[in-house]
Amino acid sequence: MANDSSTDGRFSEKLRVPEALTFDDVLLRPAESRVEPDDADVATRVSTNVELEVPVLSAAMDTVTESRLAIAMAREGGLGVLHQNMDTDRVVAEVERVKRADELVIDRENVVTAAPEQTVEAVDEMMDRSDVSGAPVVDDDDTVRGIISATDIRPYLEVGESDAVREAMTDEVITAPEDITARDALELMYEHKIERVPIVNDEQHLVGLVTMQGILERREHGSAARDQNGRLRVGVAVGPFDTERATAVDEAGADVLFIDCAHAHNLNVIDSAREIKASVDADVVVGNVGTREAAEAVVDFADGIKVGIGPGSICTTRVVTGSGMPQITAVSQVADVAAPAGVPVIADGGIRYSGDAAKAIAAGADAVMLGSYFAGTDEAPGRVITMNGKKYKQYRGMGSVGAMQSGGSDRYLKDDDEDEEYVPEGVEAATPYKGSLASELHQLVGGIQSGMGYVGAESIPAFKADAEFVRVSAAGQTEGHPHDVMITDEAPNYSPQGE
């Protein structure tokens, strides 16, 4: 009889496995409370130096977050994270677009200007590329000579597009000094019926620009996420080995860099992340991880840790690789390490309902990141699709074949080789069209606040400290959803599939 070397049990012992839970496995235990949901404070910290009024980030996916959605997120108090399927020049331009969106005084280096001798056609194309509707006209020494707007240009595009800007511009320019206040600038614009005022120094040289839109946006969005200069905050995903991109977006003004890797508990990734952290001024969040050991490997240098190995709706990592960690357990394990060190935790993926977001925070997360939840909004870049008379928007995982072909293979530590067939870890799909991001975010944050009210927690730190969980059986999960009825009027924050 052959000698059986497996009698020591070293393999069968692997099957004595710990339990791991996800959102549907648990519920928050209601507790005595004096906290009204509207009074619950959801302000939080997502990295060492970045605080938000709402604990929500949009995912760095090419069908979710580009500058338009990032601007909308920041205005509502959250943070948009620009995806990495863009070349460096384009992502720098996207960062600058976010930073320029709500500035009170746009700094000179960010002001789009025209020269008197340029053609009307060239300036029209320039303004279209820069997404602005007007520009000061300046000489070589930056002396303001006029101002030109899309309204000035429009008649010339039909009959005189080769005419010089000096022919089309308004040369009687209303300017303002460097110390002008928002109120004074607004009054000046109303008085002269103009939408933009160049800011000049004593020599009449251009030093900045104030716009009506910028002032009104700042007034409307009092809880917006802003940096120390009053500009909207923005995050950027960078590949784990792309130091050049990290440096470029840091110089462009990005507030947080997200090391964007499906498995950040890779020693090569960690070494490179340390180097990136040392080379930039922005905060650096490392992810994704899913275990206590992974958190221990990065907690000494990371400004934040992002959690999620395969929980996303379009992610196939767990079935393709057989690897992953259910999200509630993953968040709690990482938080056990990160919280004592004062490092924020971001739960990334698997959140279908606002209650899932509340559970993630109660389990130790400081904020949540969502993809499909925002992919169906107006501001997301995915194209609109109509199927069976219903509108959807394109949504795909960054591990899908399409996303990898667009440059996302770096996230999965795979070479970008056109001759090699990809092994995807995601799918391409569609998500129902939802309307504005502000409406979706309102429902999400409102659900989190209601969860805090049930627990009796008036702040995110109190919620994390005081919340308790109970296990839920399969019957309990069924009981928790609408049952034994036919839904006739859909609620804005619920669908049976969690769409």
From Swiss-Prot:
Stated name of the protein: Inosine-5'-monophosphate dehydrogenase
Catalytic activity: IMP + NAD(+) + H2O = XMP + NADH + H(+)
EC number: 1.1.1.205
Binding site for NAD(+): D260, G308, I309, G310
UniProt keyword Oxidoreductase present: yes
Binding positions for K(+) per the UniProt entry: G310, G312, C315, E479, G480, H481
Cofactor(s) this protein cannot do without: K(+)
Entry similarity comment: Belongs to the IMPDH/GMPR family.
GO molecular function: IMP dehydrogenase activity; metal ion binding; nucleotide binding
Function comment: Catalyzes the conversion of inosine 5'-phosphate (IMP) to xanthosine 5'-phosphate (XMP), the first committed and rate-limiting step in the de novo synthesis of guanine nucleotides, and therefore plays an important role in the regulation of cell growth.
GO BP annotations, alphabetical order: GMP biosynthetic process; GTP biosynthetic process
